[in-house]
Amino acid sequence: MTEKEGTFRFKQFRVRQSRCAMKVGTDGVLLGALAIVENQESRVASQESNRPIVKCLDLGTGTGLIALMIAQRNPEALITAIDIDAGAAGQAAENFALSPWADRLTAVCGDVRESGDDGKFDLIVCNPPFYEHSPAASSVARDTARRTDTLTHEQLVECASRLLVNDGRLEVIIPYATTDEFVHLGWLRGLHLVRRIDIRTKAAKPYKRSVLSLVKIEELKNGRIEHTHSFLTLLNPDSTPTDEYRELTRDFYLDK
């Protein structure tokens, strides 16, 4: 159940959003559901065992939705959620306190570009600003939340490379048209693509979003890195959710 200026209800938690410029949306739900939050086989030459996902950072958290979804999916995760907007950080803190995982969620108001937590996080998730140099949004807060003038993709990958542990992972959802450029920016910073999922609303529509998984690797174990590439369609021709989308979100949406 959703109210634009009120509360969005999920199966295990609620998201209040009246003080956030950017409301709960499909992009955030997709990243929260698709992000790899479980332990994965190490790709680092000096590391033999799997790296556990424990310390996580939700960059530009907004309402805290993605952090809450990660907390639900991974019972071991300790999640820090940062936002440059005080209203959003305060709203996220409120949502965390009302959730079943309040002891594992921390909201911080700050600029990630000034963070001193170098090499701290196993996982960084981000639903970043999605347009550059576009006409101003309807409010200063919304403009700050949406414009890549505030945090560019280049700055995002630089921050992720600095803040991740070796073998740590960056999970993002970005516009499909910017995917190749983003992957290249990541590669320049030692973040290597391991998974790509292209997403469209309907089969007759063009792809609009991509969810990318990039791993920080300072020394490769077996040389070249291969990545998987898959596709997701959200709606059937009659606008009902596809079986794949229903399955993906069944643990979250009340009506799935």
Residue ranges and their predicted role:
Residues 128-155, 159-162:
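Mobile active-site "lid"/loop adjacent to the S-adenosyl-L-methionine
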Residues 33-39, 52-119, 123-126, 132-137:
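Conserved SAM/SAH cofactor-binding pocket of Class I
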Residues 31, 127, 156, 214:
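Residue-level signal for inorganic ion chemistry
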Residues 16, 80, 106-108, 194-197:
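General small-molecule cofactor/ligand-binding pocket signal
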Residues 206-256:
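SAM/dcSAM-binding transferase cores
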Residues 20, 24, 150-207:
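Conserved Class I SAM-dependent methyltransferase catalytic core
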Residues 3-39, 53, 59-69, 227, ...:
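SAM-dependent Rossmann-like transferase core, predominantly class I methyltransferases
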Residues 37-55, 217, 222:
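Short, basic, low-complexity termini and linkers enriched in Ser/Thr/Gly/Pro
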